[in-house]
């Protein structure tokens, strides 16, 4: 299965694609960020994020998309920008009929390090090891996107089976 992980943000939106599956070691397909200038208007920045994610969807052809859930922060402007960029990714995936997994930072950390309280250095170290990379992906947004993709690769299929077995059938 090929998964696109999206670490949403307006200044830097991390994107990472991995391939893998049950009993198959995950490997890196592509990793990077979409950058927008902090001086640009929000609408312009969201369009740039949308164009960037859309290009990644075209180029890498994922089967699923994993997006970080927004969590409360002291800076409301940061929260709003993160939520807006995440919504762009969700809409683009939905328009293509791709399943979307939403994960909290602690769920992602637990999936890749075994601890929901891991710091960025621990997450980066594990991403480097799990994907057999020679160096850690930079910036941190790119590493976080790969962590999201791995989290979905490992947890997404089980969650889908659980949802389809629940009364009322599958939901998104």
Curated annotation (Swiss-Prot):
UniProt: Mg(2+) 1 binding residues: 7, 141
Main function: The RuvA-RuvB-RuvC complex processes Holliday junction (HJ) DNA during genetic recombination and DNA repair. Endonuclease that resolves HJ intermediates. Cleaves cruciform DNA by making single-stranded nicks across the HJ at symmetrical positions within the homologous arms, yielding a 5'-phosphate and a 3'-hydroxyl group; requires a central core of homology in the junction. The consensus cleavage sequence is 5'-(A/T)TT(C/G)-3'. Cleavage occurs on the 3'-side of the TT dinucleotide at the point of strand exchange.
GO BP annotation list: DNA recombination; DNA repair
Organism: Frankia casuarinae (strain DSM 45818 / CECT 9043 / HFP020203 / CcI3)
Record text on subunit structure and interactions: Homodimer which binds Holliday junction (HJ) DNA. The HJ becomes 2-fold symmetrical on binding to RuvC with unstacked arms; it has a different conformation from HJ DNA in complex with RuvA. In the full resolvosome a probable DNA-RuvA(4)-RuvB(12)-RuvC(2) complex forms which resolves the HJ.
GO molecular function: crossover junction DNA endonuclease activity; DNA binding; magnesium ion binding
Keyword Metal-binding recorded: yes
Domain of life of the native organism: Bacteria
Alphabetical UniProt keywords: Cytoplasm, DNA damage, DNA recombination, DNA repair, DNA-binding, Endonuclease, Hydrolase, Magnesium, Metal-binding, Nuclease
Enzyme Commission number(s) from the entry: 3.1.21.10
Cellular localisation: Cytoplasm
Full protein name: Crossover junction endodeoxyribonuclease RuvC
GO terms under cellular component: cytoplasm; Holliday junction resolvase complex
